[in-house]
């Protein structure tokens, strides 16, 4: 006999609550509606989301797609009971990967999977996704909520995001004219962003701290809230600088793998990025992680962003103008180094000086 007292099993008896899913959809409709933009003004609930490239102003576009997740930063959100910002991280990780190719983010879809659906928790998560979409200027045109009993324990859940953007043909980055002597600018990160959290959690465990403990590196905040500071979204300032200065040659989103894995992805094989580590203003969270965990400088550089979330490559004569344009849009910009010649087989990122850890 089912839990409802009737003969025969129901989907609810198997752990899937369709009514909870419907309630979640109703809760998130205003947030989703708030992300509408030219090209996307439909309602959620259809079998697929629509986007009109002509209505968005494109004439001969190249589509650019990216997908990503939030990693084990989610575990902190789950354990701390703070779910309203990880959606911003989800969007940021995808749309920042689009803008580095010169593409304007247009649409976003999310995948939210959990063992037992909590409509309030889900609404908080999707509210963060919608906030990230508004900041990036892209429409949340659909998604999938999957309640899967037995697949996730306790209140665990996972998120994945999918973003599509576009650039007019011939305007994609990196440009083909990166040259020796070009200047490397760095845009400040908001914190750890969404990479390296397995190491972060290990360090916190070794320190014997709970997520509700005062953050040793952020006055007035709990450790959980401070570490959950959402990933910075660089889309609108970078798109404006790309269009107005026409001087950006390459961009690199500093994610997993840090400088040594991400910068070379946008460079020709004969050039390397020479970074003066002393020019980086290192946020206190990274100093705390390094000292508390005994993490060496090179390990920090290949695990975390260390205070720089985005790299910008420009010709030396345009560096000041590009920096000023980005600063006018609220970015904190530092001149980090320059492009140098690279021997075959040599690393694509080399360092001078030391980090201020």
From Swiss-Prot:
Keywords carried by this UniProt record: ATP-binding, Cytoplasm, Ligase, Nucleotide-binding, Purine biosynthesis
Localization (cell): Cytoplasm
SUPFAM superfamilies in alphabetical order: PurM C-terminal domain-like (SSF56042), PurM N-terminal domain-like (SSF55326)
Pfam families according to UniProt: AIRS, AIRS_C
EC number from the UniProt entry: 6.3.3.1
Primary location class: cytoplasm
GO terms, biological process: 'de novo' IMP biosynthetic process; adenine biosynthetic process
Signal peptide: none
One GO CC term on file: cytosol
InterPro entries: PurM-like_C_dom, PurM-like_C_sf, PurM-like_N, PurM-like_N_sf, PurM_cligase
Molecular function GO labels: ATP binding; phosphoribosylamine-glycine ligase activity; phosphoribosylformylglycinamidine cyclo-ligase activity
Pathway: Purine metabolism; IMP biosynthesis via de novo pathway; 5-amino-1-(5-phospho-D-ribosyl)imidazole from N(2)-formyl-N(1)-(5-phospho-D-ribosyl)glycinamide: step 2/2
Disulfide bridge map: none
Residue ranges of the TM segments: none
Domain of life, source organism: Bacteria
Catalytic activity: 2-formamido-N(1)-(5-O-phospho-beta-D-ribosyl)acetamidine + ATP = 5-amino-1-(5-phospho-beta-D-ribosyl)imidazole + ADP + phosphate + H(+)
Entry's family note: Belongs to the AIR synthase family.
NCBIfam families associated with the record: purM (TIGR00878)
Official protein name in the record: Phosphoribosylformylglycinamidine cyclo-ligase
Organism from which the protein derives: Allorhizobium ampelinum (strain ATCC BAA-846 / DSM 112012 / S4)
Encoding gene, per UniProt annotation: purM
């Amino acid at each position: 006999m089912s839990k409802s007292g009737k003969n025969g099993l129901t989907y609810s008896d198997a752990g899937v609550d369709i009514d909870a899913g419907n309630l979640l959809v109703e809760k998130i409709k205003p947030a989703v509606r708030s992300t509408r933009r030219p090209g996307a003004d439909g309602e959620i609930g259809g079998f697929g989301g629509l986007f009109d490239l002509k209505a968005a102003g494109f004439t001969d576009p190249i589509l650019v797609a990216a997908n990503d997740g939030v990693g084990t930063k989610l575990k902190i959100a789950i354990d701390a009971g703070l779910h309203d910002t990880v959606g911003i991280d989800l969007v940021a990780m995808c749309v920042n990967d689009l803008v580095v190719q010169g593409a304007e983010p247009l649409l976003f879809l999310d995948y939210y999977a959990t063992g037992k659906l909590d409509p309030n928790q889900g609404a908080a998560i999707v509210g963060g996704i919608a906030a990230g979409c508004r900041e990036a200027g892209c429409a949340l045109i659909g998604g999938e909520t999957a309640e899967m009993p037995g697949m996730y324990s306790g209140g665990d859940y996972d998120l994945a995001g999918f973003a599509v953007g576009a650039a007019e043909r011939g305007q994609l980055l990196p440009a083909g004219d990166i040259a020796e002597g070009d200047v490397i600018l760095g845009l400040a990160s908001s914190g750890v962003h969404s990479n390296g959290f397995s190491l972060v959690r290990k360090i916190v465990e070794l320190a014997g701290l709970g997520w509700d403990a005062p953050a040793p590196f952020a006055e007035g905040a709990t450790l959980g809230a401070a570490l959950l500071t959402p990933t910075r979204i660089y889309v609108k300032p970078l798109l404006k600088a790309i269009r107005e200065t026409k001087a950006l040659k390459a961009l690199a989103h500093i994610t997993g793998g840090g400088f040594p894995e991400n910068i070379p992805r946008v460079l020709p094989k004969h050039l390397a990025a020479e970074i003066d580590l002393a020019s980086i203003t290192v946020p206190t969270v990274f100093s705390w992680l390094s000292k508390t965990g005994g993490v060496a400088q090179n390990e920090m550089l290949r695990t975390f962003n260390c205070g720089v979330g985005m790299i910008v490559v420009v010709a030396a004569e345009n560096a000041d103008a590009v920096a000023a344009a980005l600063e006018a849009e609220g970015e904190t910009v530092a001149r980090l180094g320059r492009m140098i010649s690279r021997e075959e087989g040599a690393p694509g990122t080399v360092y001078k000086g030391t980090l201020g850890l």
